[in-house]
């Protein structure tokens, strides 16, 4: 049976030629490792952390529970504030994710550095929270939907906006009009000849705890999630580029698994030792 995942070129020798291709050429790139942390009355900021807000309500409707929530019903997008009846907070397992990653804009550098661009990126981290009593039991709240219901898993989110400056190529600030039949609509307008941005992100919750906040004469408590964020940012332009090529890729005929022989296919797979004993480079 052919392995469709290992396509090999039958040609032992290839003739290398120069070919012109349309490519996404990277002009500037960087990586950042950010520790995002809410700062409450008991936290001393330090250079290793970036301040973010406490958890906000991500439900479509407000939530209420006069026994624990501060200030009446908590409306969507408001900070989830509660009193000292809540003794702990926890994330619902497997609910944390980057819900939205958006390049807000790419603009010429505000300090006038030629070829550099300011990139504004907004992250939205979504997750579900449990509020816990002194015994570790979940405290319910009422979701004020058209059919009100008690819930213990509360949808919440945190946002973070990053601003970085990257080289994006020196170009005149003309408007570039492009017609491409690959897309619909065909016509696009790039005002100012701005480079394109590509952003990749990986985030994980590091800790979740109760933060103490003094609002006026009132002390209230919030769910504070510390987040570790890895980001790679690239600025690129679509260009014509001359590259060395060995010709077109070979595409062999697919050899599908025949009905009735799943065991033959399974038995041909290598044993996944690394899944049982993950390798390590530590000595």
Residue map of PLM features:
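Viral structural modules
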Residues: 1-283
